From Swiss-Prot:
One of its GO terms (biological process) is regulation of pH. This is Na(+)/H(+) antiporter NhaA. The keyword NADP does not apply. The gene is nhaA. Disulfide bonds: none annotated. It is found in: Cell inner membrane. Belongs to the NhaA Na(+)/H(+) (TC 2.A.33) antiporter family. It holds the Pfam family Na_H_antiport_1. Coiled coil: none annotated.
Length: 438
């Protein structure tokens, strides 16, 4: 009965999100595998040289642009973080994070799932040049995790899918805070003041309920530039922009014109092809329906396929390729063990222990329809760090620590793969056990 209520409570938006993210996870995996194959083939020199190719335009001796790798990591990933920011805002206002009662359990779970892996890594790498990589195993890749959980189908309770999504959103918010606090260097306050001025303009547009996305996006580009120049990673600008996008729907949302257009279409004669009148009516319905959506919904709807099917796969292909040969020093400090143990052990233990303790102390309440065994399974899948972990590894290790970065990437791939396989087998076995009891 509770399971049925949970199923009904799952909104259409959330269902669409699950479907798109699950396919995106599979597509991400294929691109990661392709990157590893190419990076260890006769094409490896071309593969690595490609990402250092400068792209931009030149005026005399002045060049405006970046290497292809920086375009992906700094510009395209800003669009990904913009979408993440929109998802977080939506969940904070209307979703599973909209009240303390709803949010407390997954938020505390996310907190435990970040602290435990970070501590494991830091403990193993304390007082070494690699200790700055503690943020790497703290992340969860929602696309991969949902890809695995959706492959299990009905063997996984819907309530667990909702919990994993909410946990991952809270985890993303935590990752953004970690990036802002610990992976920011050489702050330039003049540019920060410029960024603050742009944020105030965005807040004014939001206050005026400006529904056109164009001014927000134009100011967003300016904000990205100011933040990029300030020393803070530019993806933070995208998250700030997301929180400034209006979420209110227009007051005339119960638009009678839309109903009238529907009636007009129903009254037209049907044939093998649409008539000109029917095409015009459908076009008007499309325009009216779009106008009823909030700017946040429109932008999120636009970014979701671009992020899932282009940006993230491209990021995976550009960053997952590591040439595994004798030149790699797998004994760089304890990076390999720190990342793998953080993802495979720290994530599930952190999530399980902190939620178990918080419920016993009556701070939170476990969602109906899922057992503690399910929570442990979700913790295992949360150990799939992949793209977010890769992103943080690029921030944690500069070109001076190339060995550590390469080892971290291998560890992320291994740790994510182990977590995914163990998590899937565990939830499959859990379902079989429940079926036998029946």
């Amino acid at each position: 009965m509770n399971l049925k209520k949970t199923e009904n409570a799952l909104s259409l938006t959330l269902k669409n999100f699950i479907k798109s993210e699950s396919f995106g996870g599979i597509f991400l995996f294929l691109n990661a595998v392709l990157a590893m194959v190419v990076a260890n083939s006769f094409l490896k020199e071309s593969y690595f040289a490609l990402w250092h190719t400068p792209f931009g335009f030149q005026i005399g001796d002045f060049f405006i642009g970046f290497s292809l790798h920086n375009w992906i990591d700094d510009v395209l990933m800003a669009l990904f973080f913009l979408m993440i920011g929109l998802e977080i805002k939506r969940e904070l206002l209307f979703g599973e994070l909209s009240s303390f009662k709803k949010a407390s359990f997954p938020v505390i779970a996310a907190l435990g799932g970040m602290i435990a892996p970070g501590l494991i890594y830091f403990f193993l790498n304390a007082d070494t040049p690699s200790q700055h990589g503690f943020g790497i195993p703290m992340a969860t890749d929602i696309a991969f995790a949902l890809g695995v959980i959706m492959l299990l189908g009905k063997r996984v309770p819907t309530a667990l899918k909702v919990f994993l999504i909410t946990l991952a959103v809270a985890d993303d918010l935590g990752a953004i805070i970690v990036i802002a606090l610990f992976y920011t260097t050489n702050l330039k306050f003049a540019w920060l003041l410029g960024a603050l001025g742009v944020v105030l303009l965005l807040a004014l547009l939001n206050r005026l309920n400006m529904r056109s996305l164009v001014p927000y996006l134009l100011l967003g580009v300016l904000l990205w530039f100011c933040v990029h120049q300030s020393g803070i990673h530019a993806t933070i600008a995208a998250v700030v922009l997301a929180f400034m996008i209006p979420v209110k729907i227009p007051k005339d949302s119960k638009n009678v014109e839309l109903l009238e257009l529907g009636k007009r279409y129903a009254e037209t004669s049907s044939g093998a092809l649409l008539t000109k009148e029917q095409q015009e009516i459908l076009h008007s319905i499309e325009e009216k329906a779009s106008a009823l959506q909030s700017p946040l919904e429109r932008l999120e709807h636009f970014l979701a396929p671009i992020s899932g099917y282009f940006i993230m796969p491209l990021f995976a292909f550009a960053n997952a390729g590591v040439s595994v040969d004798s030149s790699i020093n797998l004994e760089v400090d304890k990076v390999l063990f720190g990342v793998i143990l953080g993802l495979c052990l720290g994530k599930p233990l952190g999530i399980f222990l902190i939620t178990f303790i918080s419920e016993k102390l009556k701070i939170t309440a476990r969602p109906k329809g899922i057992s503690w065994w399910h929570i442990l399974g979700a913790g295992l899948l949360a150990g799939i760090g992949f793209t977010m972990s890769m992103f943080i590894s690029n921030l944690a290790f500069t070109s001076e620590h190339k060995d550590a970065m390469e080892v971290a990437k291998i560890a992320i791939l291994l740790g994510s793969l182990i977590s995914g396989i163990i998590g899937a087998l565990y939830l499959f076995a859990l379902d079989k056990r429940a079926a036998l009891k029946k």
